[in-house]
Design a protein with these regions (language model features):
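Hydrophobic alpha-helical transmembrane segments of multi-pass integral membrane proteins
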Residues: 1-265
Length: 265
């Protein structure tokens, strides 16, 4: 219980520091650091950035399309998991291929793909549309946000694989998936923070919810390691609930309210 309380305290402290830094005018984002961050978002990626479209709205479209794809995958996997609950031998023919599907594993995989794949990608897609509208500016890098959607999809795919086989070739899959998800989250956070730094008006409440949603995953990882929850064995559970809850509720509320405000304006 102590490690859970300390993790929550560190998590909310990180979010409070993030809020204060942005509210004070983003002094950490001088012209030099902005230029360096934009270089990291685009030019540092090399030729890969040239394969994605940078037109306005392309990032939102890419994320939402990926989200719909994961919606289909999550619903299918969950259905198969529930089917195996009713009839455990329904897919016994797969055992000849070396695959032994279990109901609990498939339902768990369905939850992961639904939260981080379906809901997560559609929430980020809506946020990439709403936040620039709320800030009175354009998204800092449409190209990077589009490319990062592929990295996020890869991380969700590894989550699905890791829920079935936790260790492959001596490599624990879920930490690798979390690492890729964190890298994608950092890129999205930098993109949104640069966007907010160019805001032409005060950020309304839905905009803050969107920012907290995208910083939640990074804050959860830092909180788990700082509090020692990772060594206690509860790190994965805490990370899933902290990042998932913050991301889902803040992102969904911010995206919906931001979209409504943008529509009314």
């Amino acid at each position: 219980m102590d490690v859970i309380i300390s993790t929550l305290a560190v998590f909310w402290l990180i979010l409070a520091i993030f809020f204060i830094l942005i509210k004070r005018g983003l002094w950490i984002f001088s012209d030099v650091s902005k230029s360096l961050s934009m270089f990291m978002l685009e030019k540092a990626l090399g030729p890969a950035i040239d394969f994605v479209s940078g037109r306005p709205g392309s990032a939102t479209t890419a994320w939402i399309i990926h989200g719909f794809d994961w919606t289909f995958a999550a619903s299918t996997v969950t259905f198969v998991g529930l089917w195996l609950t009713h009839d455990p031998t329904a897919l016994h023919s797969f055992e000849s291929w070396g695959y032994h599907p279990k109901s609990s594993e498939l339902i768990y995989a369905g939850r992961l793909t639904a939260l981080f794949g379906a809901i997560g990608m559609m929430v980020i897609g809506a946020s990439l549309h709403a936040l620039p509208k709320l800030s009175g500016t354009n998204l800092a890098s449409e190209s990077n946000a589009t490319l990062v959607s592929l990295l996020w999809t890869l991380s969700v795919l590894l989550m699905f694989i890791g829920s079935q086989n936790s260790v492959i070739l001596g490599i624990t899959i879920l930490p690798v998936a979390n690492l890729l998800l964190s890298l994608a989250s950092i890129a999205i956070v930098i993109n949104m923070v640069i966007t907010v730094s160019e805001a032409t008006k005060d950020i309304p409440f839905p905009g803050w919810l969107i920012l907290f949603a995208v910083i939640g995953n990074i804050a959860a990882i830092l909180a788990v390691f700082v509090s020692g929850a990772y060594e206690e064995g509860t790190g994965q559970w805490l990370h899933f609930h902290l990042s998932g809850g913050t991301f889902f509720f803040c992102g969904l509320a911010g995206g919906i309210m931001g979209g409504l405000i943008g529509y009314i304006d």
